[in-house]
């Protein structure tokens, strides 16, 4: 069994790596270099059959060009989105990694396992615990955060706008939703696939493209850019997907560039398109330029909004918390958590949720919560758990699941292991700062 895959060095030419239970192959991929994420996926699925037993990780032009906001696409609808993993693959001339499963694990023979499995399955599918994620999905949060004045609009010049009704979770579901799908083996179906229709010939010849949507992409390609047409938002998401960019960093960086253009810091000479809040067409061009590193400005912006601001000016309105902010303007605890976390990720602790339910402004209580919540999430993440299911996999249930599988020592040590992982993360962060 492979527990980890480490790929040192750099290939002499573009390659893809195919890994299976009994094989590891390096295949020439020069003909894939320069292709967008979607075209690469189509070709690789034909080359490596085995849907449901195969995972394809791939990058787009942004990764090839070394962008710090290049993502790694995982099986089309999911991503290693943040921290520039796509740029790391690109630096190695590694266009894709294909992992093919050939074996299965034996299930426990005890009567406890099927009984517990059924209980967990019912929690996932027949209770309210996960219904939010299946029904409207994470976009259900858009209207709620907008009402609380916690939703970033137009580079955070506003935190609420009545036009949210045009791009709410309900609006996307009513007018754009094609279907739900799920990660392999998951019964929830939280992936929401919308459609974009495009006329390619007169009089009535259309094609449609399928685009997955969630809260964060709608924030970054919608509210942050002032776009309130849901189909335009989906079209921008589609451009981001093809380029292989992290949608949050791309949207927030372009929002900064738009305000910089408003203030006269940037001109169309740099942006190559007239960026204006609410105008989707120039943003589609800008996303392509950002992925391609079309000029000096876009190559610098691809290293992060602060990098560009350091060169051109405008750092005071760059919405960056270590990396471009996530879609929450909930308050001090969220801002602190993302700014100081190891990955500068809103998912490392629930600071955004803490702000919404605590008005006491007590720093000690907030810090205690962040430390405790980070350790619990670190353990869940190390289990390769979906954080959407954290409400189901509470400590007692997770311990019972591990025990039923025979991992009794692990089941009895979850708190200690979570704190150990957390300590390793903090040590890594300290070492990064010393090197930096």
Identify what each model region corresponds to.
Residues 2-26, 86-90, 97, 106, ...:
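Hydrophobic or amphipathic alpha-helical targeting/insertion segments
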Residues 45-83, 89-430, 434:
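Extended C-terminal regions of large enzymes
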Residues 4, 29-33, 225, 294:
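Short secondary-structure transition/capping motifs
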Residues 17-64:
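Acidic/Gly/His-enriched mid-domain segments of enzyme catalytic cores or analogous surface patches
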